[in-house]
Amino acid sequence: MARYRHSRSRSRSRYRRRRRRRSRYRSRRRXYRGRRRRRSRRGRRRRGYSRRRYSRRRRRRY
């Protein structure tokens, strides 16, 4: 676990410097990373609530 944490902090500092150069590539990957993180943390609490809402919206859309 310690190794993983250290590598993560290092990659963060590197990405901050490359943010201006590869803004498109970073936005795509971040995104993706942010989605994964939000699902793991808030997914458990909002699963029931989000399912009710999405089910109604999907039924109307489709």
From Swiss-Prot:
Region of interest (Disordered), ranges: 1-62
GO molecular function, one term: DNA binding
GO biological process: chromosome condensation; sperm DNA condensation
Keywords: Chromosome, Developmental protein, Differentiation, DNA condensation, DNA-binding, Nucleosome core, Nucleus, Spermatogenesis
Distribution of this protein across tissues and organs: Testis.
Subcellular location: Nucleus; Chromosome
InterPro entries: Protamine_P1
Keyword Nucleus: yes
This protein's GO CC annotations: nucleosome; nucleus
Domain of life: Eukaryota
Main subcellular localisation: nucleus
Similarity annotation: Belongs to the protamine P1 family.
Record function comment: Protamines substitute for histones in the chromatin of sperm during the haploid phase of spermatogenesis. They compact sperm DNA into a highly condensed, stable and inactive complex.
Protein name: Sperm protamine P1
Provenance organism: Dorcopsulus vanheurni
The gene coding this protein: PRM1
